């Protein structure tokens, strides 16, 4: 039961944080590129890598990794925004968004793990 509570608590704060950051960026950046989701997912990849690399206890992994990072990052919004770019026939931004998110996300997760100690 405590594990579920840790995940739920982390998820609550992760979702609220993503909502706030996403709205802040969208109000200030009027661009075709989905900058808010991109930065949230890259930051989340780095932080999750750092959490895992740091060797934190299972409780902290559940709270911060599964809960907070699981709700903070967003695979579904990433895919939706990519499809919307395609529907608007914005192929160059679509390709940039897809490739940058995957490549930079993996690099930042690796960097987080290295800085965390793995």
From Swiss-Prot:
Pfam families: CRCB. Its main location: membrane. Keywords: Cell membrane, Ion channel, Ion transport, Membrane, Metal-binding, Sodium, Transmembrane, Transmembrane helix, Transport. The keyword Transmembrane applies. Fluoride-specific ion channel. Important for reducing fluoride concentration in the cell, thus reducing its toxicity. Belongs to the fluoride channel Fluc/FEX (TC 1.A.43) family. PANTHER family: FLUORIDE EXPORT PROTEIN 1-RELATED, FLUORIDE-SPECIFIC ION CHANNEL FLUC 2. This is Fluoride-specific ion channel FluC 2.
